[in-house]
Amino acid sequence: MPLHKSAEKRLRQSERKNARNRARKKELKVLLKNMQKLIDARADKSEVEAAYRSAVQKLDRLGVKRYIHANKASRKKSQLTRLFNNYGKAE
């Protein structure tokens, strides 16, 4: 336990930030899983495109605001784009 008042405040702030970060990363994880489920289920191209756009938008936002590293955001976007572009070609 913190001994100083300022340390207690920093602990409270840290817990709030940690909860926010976890929530944002969880949202991203859910979006990525939803897109993968749609691809696996061979869903309509428009549904997959909507999932792709929302996932890329979330990745951009998290990368810019440094919730995830910019290179990780770029790598994930590249992987998603490759999945999306190849969707429907293998049929």
From Swiss-Prot:
Top-level taxon in the UniProt lineage: Bacteria
Any one Gene Ontology cellular component term annotated for this protein: small ribosomal subunit
Full protein name: Small ribosomal subunit protein bS20
Residue ranges of the region described as Disordered: 1-25
Summary of the function given for this chain in its UniProt record: Binds directly to 16S ribosomal RNA.
UniProt similarity note: Belongs to the bacterial ribosomal protein bS20 family.
InterPro entries: Ribosomal_bS20 (IPR002583), Ribosomal_bS20_sf (IPR036510)
Organism: Chlorobium limicola (strain DSM 245 / NBRC 103803 / 6330)
GO molecular function: small ribosomal subunit rRNA binding; structural constituent of ribosome
Keywords: Ribonucleoprotein, Ribosomal protein, RNA-binding, rRNA-binding
Bias kind Basic and acidic residues: ranges: 1-18
GO biological process, one term: translation
UniProt gene name: rpsT
